């Protein structure tokens, strides 16, 4: 197995499920946002404030290219990673892509108290999440080998579902 790459909106459970999946498969877990923070010595909101979203996306693109070149990694990506064609290509070529789908209602509940999400610093975070999902959902689906629903499911059950469904995929 090369890599397992988790894509999906914020609040879908990419980091939580990614850690569990990596532990189960005895693989290394990487979170592209956390890796950017470690490399920069600053958190994502600070990078957004100082460099804007384009500056952050440039850093993200470089990090995704680097992480997708590894072998034996479970990679959790940021929700907007799929917005750039270069990222979609790197993710698709980097391993099996798993789209963790979550409804806007679930995303709202899971992100409500998280201050580390610059795109949700709006008057109406739910409307923002809805707009983001409408824009990004087709891009997640474009590169996904699997689409896995996370609504109302404990992370452990999602991991079991992923493992079972991965075995059914034909080699590529």
Swiss-Prot record:
Listed GO biological process terms: amino acid biosynthetic process; aromatic amino acid family biosynthetic process; chorismate biosynthetic process
Main location: cytoplasm
Catalytic class of the enzyme: transferase
Superkingdom per UniProt: Bacteria
GO molecular function: ATP binding; magnesium ion binding; shikimate kinase activity
One Gene Ontology CC term in the entry: cytosol
Note accompanying the cofactor annotation: Binds 1 Mg(2+) ion per subunit.
Protein role: Catalyzes the specific phosphorylation of the 3-hydroxyl group of shikimic acid using ATP as a cosubstrate.
Assembly and oligomerization: Monomer.
Identification of the protein by name: Shikimate kinase
Protein species of origin: Pseudomonas putida (strain ATCC 47054 / DSM 6125 / CFBP 8728 / NCIMB 11950 / KT2440)
Taxonomic lineage of the native organism: Bacteria, Pseudomonadati, Pseudomonadota, Gammaproteobacteria, Pseudomonadales
Gene: aroK
